[in-house]
């Protein structure tokens, strides 16, 4: 069970598959964030997989989920590609988001992507500009928490990633969960961890940075 408002690396690894299923089912754009009501903006999941890194023990094993999404507007010739990972930071004892973004000027009507014509976005100013443009957002819209550039803590390549520093995450998540009383004693550990990750997603993960990209279930008839 979750204690003192935090989960362990072991709990993250154990229940990340359930949260990933929730992510794949419910990741969508919120129409109200678009000038046109969202009809001209689309979100497509291009890729999603889990990677487990070698470790001597089950408790110290490191796992991350990598997802690629494409944000596009039907009236624009380009789209915004976002790769993001969900992983666990041992020092801060919280989940952490890393993401990188690309401008794609060659997305065909069939949805195929020419990787040779994808341009990395390497500044927050360029990221914000492309995000506004693709989704048709007004220039006075704001992104969520401040992001910085860094290398990925688990992926050892030359890529530069955006990320939200996790120094305040534990304190803030504890406050949110206590205020909403969202973790019930009768909940299973799996349900508690999935709830915890959902709150984290909305505040310090992709949904916190890009408020229009939400984990919102499809309305039931």
UniProtKB/Swiss-Prot annotation:
Give the enzyme's EC designation: 2.3.2.-
Q: Which InterPro entries match?
A: Atg3/Atg10
**Localization of this protein:** Preautophagosomal structure membrane
Name a biological process GO annotation: autophagy
What topology does the record note for this protein and the membrane?
Peripheral membrane protein
Q: Which GO terms describe its cellular component?
A: phagophore assembly site membrane
Catalytic site positions: 167 (glycyl thioester intermediate)
Q: Which UniProt keywords apply?
A: Autophagy, Membrane, Protein transport, Transferase, Transport, Ubl conjugation pathway
| Top EC class, one word | transferase
The cross-references to Gene3D superfamilies, in alphabetical order and at most eight, read: 3.30.1460.50
A single GO molecular function term of this UniProt record: ubiquitin-like protein transferase activity
UniProt keyword annotation of Membrane present? yes
Name the protein family. Answer: Belongs to the ATG10 family.
- Its quaternary structure? Forms homooligomers.
* UniProt-recorded name of the protein: Ubiquitin-like-conjugating enzyme ATG10
Q: Which organism is it from?
A: Debaryomyces hansenii (strain ATCC 36239 / CBS 767 / BCRC 21394 / JCM 1990 / NBRC 0083 / IGC 2968)
Q: What is the lineage of its organism?
A: Eukaryota, Fungi, Dikarya, Ascomycota, Saccharomycotina
Q: Which gene encodes it?
A: ATG10
């Amino acid at each position: 069970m979750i204690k003192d408002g935090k989960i362990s690396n072991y709990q993250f690894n154990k229940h990340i598959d359930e949260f990933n299923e929730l992510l794949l089912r419910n990741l969508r754009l919120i129409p109200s964030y678009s000038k046109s009501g969202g009809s001209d903006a689309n979100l497509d999941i291009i890729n999603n997989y889990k990677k487990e890194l070698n470790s001597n023990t089950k408790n110290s094993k490191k796992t991350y989920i990598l997802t690629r999404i494409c944000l596009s507007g039907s009236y624009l010739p380009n789209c915004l590609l976002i790769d993001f990972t969900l992983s666990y930071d041992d020092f801060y004892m919280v989940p952490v988001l890393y993401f990188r973004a690309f401008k794609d000027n060659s997305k065909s009507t069939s949805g195929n992507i020419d990787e040779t014509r994808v341009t990395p976005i390497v500044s927050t100013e360029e990221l914000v500009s492309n995000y506004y443009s693709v989704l048709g957002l007004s220039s006075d819209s704001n992104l969520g928490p401040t992001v910085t550039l860094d290398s990925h803590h688990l992926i050892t390549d030359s890529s530069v990633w955006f990320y939200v520093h996790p120094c305040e995450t534990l304190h803030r998540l504890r406050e949110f969960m206590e205020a909403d009383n969202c973790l019930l004693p009768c909940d299973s550990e799996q349900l508690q961890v999935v709830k915890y990750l959902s709150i984290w997603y909305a505040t310090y993960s992709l949904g916190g940075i890009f408020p229009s990209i939400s984990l919102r279930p499809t309305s039931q008839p």
